[in-house]
Structures are given as structure tokens and as C-alpha cells.
Amino acid sequence: MRGVVKELNDDGFGVLGNVLVPFSAPGDEVEILKIEKVKKAKIASKWKLIKSSPLRVGARCKVFGRCGGCSLQHLSYDYQLEFKGERIRRLLGVDVEVIPSPRIFGHRNRIDLAVTVEGIGFRERGKWWKIVDIQECPVFGKTSRKAIERLREFIEEERISVWNVKKDEGFLRYMVLREGKFTGEVMVNLVTKEGKLPDPSKYFDFATSIYWSVNRTKSDVSYGEVESVWGREFITEKLDDVIYLIHPNSFFQTNSYQAVNLVKKVSELVEGERVLDMYSGVGTFGIYLAKRGFKVVGFDSNEFAIEMARKNAKINKVDAVFDVATDREVEVNGFDTVIVDPPRVGLHPKLIKKLNREKPEVIVYVSCNPKTFARDIEKLEYKIDEIVALDMFPHTPHLELVAKLIV
């Protein structure tokens, strides 16, 4: 089968007839050599590029096309933004500005590297059992090269057994790297099964903090029961004038440079004085707003996230209040603005009913999933007053939406 790729679907796959062509560009002339059926989709698992699209650029990553991390690195950044804007236009029927990421390489502040008999790196696209060995991750930056080199030395010199994914054997499973892009602080977290970890401190002497996490379950996860091995308990990140503590088991926006624009945009859309910060996490929005004089109350169902939010409030010397509660339990009356930043599944139906009943003046909806955002907007008795998209995830199809909703 031979032809010209017409467009990209929402997942960033090129479309040629009824076949999806990964890592292709609109305007590419391709010859499909092998097709595999994945669920209900036909995927070109092997294809040849006959003539390149003018939208193509050289990928900076040496393993691009195999690694499952980035899927759009072969496209010009201008076109990536155009593609994301068109995706939102198709979904919502409105033109939305897509704010570009201030940096498109070295922007990620976290990567979870599998440590296996095949190598150190990420899973191959569509193959959970295969790991693509890497020397450096360009979207994380130069610290990744140093950390991977030191990890190889640590494994070899200390004779550490590493993960055999297919057999589910081996001691050392993951290395999670986190970096404060505005502070330069680095955290190395080594994730293992039960056993004894040799002292890693001399190998990772560039790190601010070294942790050992033990995964005692059968689940394939890059976290566990944590123990501080060396250095500080937390690293820090700074967004404008706000400091945030980073712990191995706490969530933080993965693109620090664009996160500055995100918190600024949310603060611009807030009205009134009293703000309810739903799904507050570690207080990313709430503390930024409290620093600017808003009276903030935040809730999250994750106890550890709330513990971190309280610590962040304390170090920033703000009076924001954070408590543990589910989205179904929180009372929304008495607030001028309600911020909602739900997980990818979107808002709980009971919360939607509560918002429709109590009618806070303004809702600021932050979404990492445009599809569930569109679904929730249909159910909320509000209209979109302002909406913008932020490219938090360059070289992927994903983006963040921020909308101001009014009655």
C-alpha cells in the first residue's frame, strides 16, 4: 500500500486511508510494508518513507521512532502547535490560542527510567516488555546523561542485579530523576524490590537528594516505601516568587517553565476574594494565589498531597488552608471562584450537580484531558468566558486547557 498521509488523528498518528502510520507527517509519501491490528485499529508496524513532508524536521533524540516517550519530535514545533489547536477546534468548535512552551528540550523535570537487562531507558512504543536503551533524554536535559552514566557504574561496580521484565526478576527496577529547573537541585530515586541496596552516594555525588524506594507489591510501578539515603529530605522548585517542596512521592507539573505560565493564567482568571482550590495537590495554584492576597481553602483526597501543601504554605508564609476530602464531600458555597483541576477522568457527577446547584460566580477549569473537559462542559450550567491551551508537553499530542466559566 502506497500513498500520501493526509492528516494526524488526535493521538498523533498519520492517517492513510483506514491505516494509522506512527511517526509520520501530513504530506509524507509512504509505502506501508506491514500492518498489525491493535484492538480495532490498523497500525502500520513497518513502513518506508518515499518523499518527506515539508513539515518534517530532524529529531534531536537518537532513539526517536522506537522510544514510546515522544511521538511528534519529527514535526516542526510551529506545526505541533497548529495540530494541537486544530485538535481543540474539532472537539470544542472554537478557536483556542495555544501558548507555546518556553523551552521544547530540557523542559521535563521528571523522568522514570526502567533499569533492565536490555538497558536503561523507556519502553518501546506498543511493547511493554521491550526497553529502549538510552544515553540521554533530550526532553529532560544534560543531567540525564550524567545520571545514567553513574547508574551504569553503580550497577557494574556493586554487581547489582537488574530487572528482567519478561521473567519479572531482578532487584533494581527504576531510577526516577527529578530536577528543579529554576533551582538546579536534583533528586535521584532508586526503586527496587526487597533486598539490600549498596551505598549509592559516591556515584550520585551531584545530587541534592538520594532516595531508595522499595516496591513490595507485584505491581510494575516506579515508587514504593521511601527511605532517604543521602542529602536533603526535599528538593525545591520555584515558580515566580513561590517555592515548592518536591518529594519522591509527590506530584508536580512536569514542565516547570510552562508551569509558570499556567499559574499566572489561573491567577488572571480568578475573581473575588475567596477561592476554593479543588484537587489542590501540593498547593500549586492555591499557594500562588494566597501569595497574591486571595483567601484560599484547598482540598484533595490524597493525604500526602495535603501534607505537602501545608508544608508549602508554611515555607511561603501564607495562610492558605488545606484539608483532606473527596470531590464529592466538599461544600462549594461561600466561594467567589472555584478552581477545579481533576485527573484525566474529569469531574465526578456529584460535584457537577453541586456546582450547578450552588452556582459559584466563577469556575476556573484546568484540564489535562480535552475529551473529558468537553464532556463536563456539556453538563455544567455554565458558559465559557475565556479559554486558552498551554503546551505543557512538547513533542506529544497532549496539552493543558484552562477555561474561565461563568453562569
UniProtKB/Swiss-Prot annotation:
The keyword S-adenosyl-L-methionine applies. CDD domains: AdoMet_MTases. Catalyzes the formation of 5-methyl-uridine at position 54 (m5U54) in tRNA. [4Fe-4S] cluster binds at residues 61, 67, 70, 137. One of its GO terms (biological process) is tRNA methylation. S-adenosyl-L-methionine binds at residues 253, 279, 284, 300-301, 327, 341. The active site is at residues 368, 400. NCBIfam families: rumA. Belongs to the class I-like SAM-binding methyltransferase superfamily. RNA M5U methyltransferase family. It comes from Pyrococcus horikoshii (strain ATCC 700860 / DSM 12428 / JCM 9974 / NBRC 100139 / OT-3). GO terms for molecular function: 4 iron, 4 sulfur cluster binding; metal ion binding; tRNA (uracil(54)-C5)-methyltransferase activity, S-adenosyl methionine-dependent. This is tRNA (uracil(54)-C(5))-methyltransferase. Keywords: 4Fe-4S, Iron, Iron-sulfur, Metal-binding, Methyltransferase, S-adenosyl-L-methionine, Transferase, tRNA processing.
